[in-house]
């Protein structure tokens, strides 16, 4: 009976331990040293804080300031006004230079005035088209892309018309000199010789024309055809008494 009582006592203690363990909760088995889990949790929290700080730093970069459409339109209008003002000043300067040129006939003055007026109208029209966003197809010299001989011939005509409208300006000869020099920089020597020969021939032709005009002016200021007054008097006296004696000789001595 004693043995049975001891076994019963052992069973009783085991049961009591099991009941106490069940009441207090499951037993947690730790695979790591004490404090190791806590350090890992702390490191995880540090990573979370760093990520949060990076996110707060990156957020202001993503925000973009949007410029109001009204402000953009005002800036565009201001640019157009400045461009128009600049073009008007250039036209005014050209008109002043043209007015200072000597020996301009009234017809030439009227033609120059009409030309300046047309340039002003074209400038205003282009500004109005740009302001209202009107897309006009490009024509004329700006639309050309010459590739054949005929294309370059037509291109040259349009370019000549574009340039020669400023030929009355005081700066026109210097402009042409610089232009010809700049556009001929890439040419070969043989091509430059051909261009030089053409300009030399043109120079000789202009000199001949000037000499011819000078001779014509001198002839107009020369002696009147027929001998003038003296010739007419000689003819009259010759008819009256002859040139050898009489009034004819006296007239010669007097003259």
UniProtKB/Swiss-Prot annotation:
UniProt-annotated location(s): Cytoplasm
Coiled coil segments of this chain: 69-131
GO CC annotations, alphabetized: eukaryotic 43S preinitiation complex; eukaryotic 48S preinitiation complex; eukaryotic translation initiation factor 3 complex
Biased composition (Acidic residues): 1-16, 34-53
Entry's Gene Ontology BP terms: formation of cytoplasmic translation initiation complex
This protein's record includes keyword Coiled coil: yes
Region annotation Disordered: where it falls in the sequence: 1-107
Biased composition (Basic and acidic residues): 54-95
The UniProt record lists the keyword Glycosyltransferase: no
UniProt xrefs under Pfam families: eIF3_subunit
PANTHER family to which the protein is assigned, alphabetical: EUKARYOTIC TRANSLATION INITIATION FACTOR 3 SUBUNIT J (PTHR21681:SF0)
Summary of subunit composition and partner proteins: Component of the eukaryotic translation initiation factor 3 (eIF-3) complex, which is composed of 13 subunits: eif3a, eif3b, eif3c, eif3d, eif3e, eif3f, eif3g, eif3h, eif3i, eif3j, eif3k, eif3l and eif3m.
Record's function text: Component of the eukaryotic translation initiation factor 3 (eIF-3) complex, which is involved in protein synthesis of a specialized repertoire of mRNAs and, together with other initiation factors, stimulates binding of mRNA and methionyl-tRNAi to the 40S ribosome. The eIF-3 complex specifically targets and initiates translation of a subset of mRNAs involved in cell proliferation.
Record family assignment: Belongs to the eIF-3 subunit J family.
Protein name, UniProt field: Eukaryotic translation initiation factor 3 subunit J
Higher taxonomy: Eukaryota, Metazoa, Chordata, Craniata, Vertebrata
């Amino acid at each position: 009976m004693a043995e049975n009582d001891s076994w019963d006592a052992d069973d009783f203690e085991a049961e009591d331990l099991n009941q106490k363990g069940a009441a207090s909760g499951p037993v947690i088995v730790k695979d790591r040293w004490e404090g190791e889990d806590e350090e890992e949790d702390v490191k995880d929290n540090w990573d979370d804080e760093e990520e949060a700080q990076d996110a707060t730093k990156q957020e202001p970069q993503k925000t973009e300031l949007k410029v109001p459409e009204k402000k953009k339109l005002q800036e565009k209008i201001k640019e157009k006004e400045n461009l128009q003002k600049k073009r008007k000043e250039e036209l005014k300067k050209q008109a002043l230079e043209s007015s200072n040129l000597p020996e301009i006939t009234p017809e030439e003055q009227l033609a120059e005035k009409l030309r300046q007026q047309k340039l002003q109208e074209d400038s205003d029209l282009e500004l109005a088209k740009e302001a209202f966003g009107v897309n006009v197809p490009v024509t004329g010299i700006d639309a050309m892309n010459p590739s054949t001989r005929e294309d370059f011939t037509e291109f040259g005509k349009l370019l000549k018309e574009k340039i020669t409208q400023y030929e009355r300006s005081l700066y026109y000869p210097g402009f042409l000199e610089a232009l010809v020099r700049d556009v001929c920089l890439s040419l070969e020597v043989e091509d430059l010789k051909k261009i030089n020969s053409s300009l030399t021939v043109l120079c000789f032709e202009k000199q001949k024309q000037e000499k011819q005009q000078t001779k014509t002016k001198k002839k107009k200021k020369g002696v009147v055809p027929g001998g003038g007054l003296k010739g007419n008097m000689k003819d009259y006296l010759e008819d009256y008494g002859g040139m050898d004696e009489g009034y004819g000789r006296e007239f010669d001595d007097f003259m």
